[in-house]
Amino acid sequence: MLLINGSVLGAMVDLIHAIAEFLNLFFAGVLAGEELVICYGVRTVVTVLDQRPQIELRHALIRKLRALEPAIFILTALSGLAAMSLDGTGAGFRLRCFATLCLLIWVVITLFGTIPIKKDTLAWRPDAPPTDWKVLLRRWERFDIARCWAAVISFAFLVAAVGMG
């Protein structure tokens, strides 16, 4: 009953592949959307605040997002690996590889760019930040823009890969 000319097994593999692709697109889209909203929505609004409320808001955002972003990334990466392994070297394989590369760029920027700055930022006193706090924030924002576009381009490659399949 498990194998009727291979069609039941083949249908199950196809279903699992479709679910993996859906989950991968979903989580990659959530990651890209979250990055876009933070980068071009929240960040631009935060900068108009005075020093104390700006730093307090940044502290709150860092604390909230430091659990959410890794969870979204892990789900994106795991579903991507599943979809890629089930897809094999099909039509969208190269695009999935480019998407994975963009996701790796996102990770490198996060680990070596934004996380150290966020860690330092949490130590700032809102009423007495370091004298160069605005310079540090501009550096953080450059990393944030690069991260955002790495996530968005990764998502675009995944959409194209699914479209080719």
List PLM regions with ranges.
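Interfacial segments of alpha-helical transmembrane regions
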Residues: 14-29, 89-104
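Juxtamembrane boundary at the C-terminal end of a transmembrane helix
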Residues: 159-165
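Interfacial loop at the N-terminal end of multi-pass membrane proteins
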Residues: 17-22, 28-75, 122-137
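Mid-bilayer segments of alpha-helical transmembrane spans in multi-pass integral membrane proteins
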Residues: 104-112
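Short, strongly hydrophobic alpha-helical membrane anchors
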Residues: 1-18
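Membrane-proximal soluble regions of multi-pass membrane proteins
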Residues: 134-142, 147
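Membrane-helix exit/interface motif
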Residues: 40-41, 73, 77-90, 113
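Core segments of transmembrane alpha-helices
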Residues: 70-83, 147-156
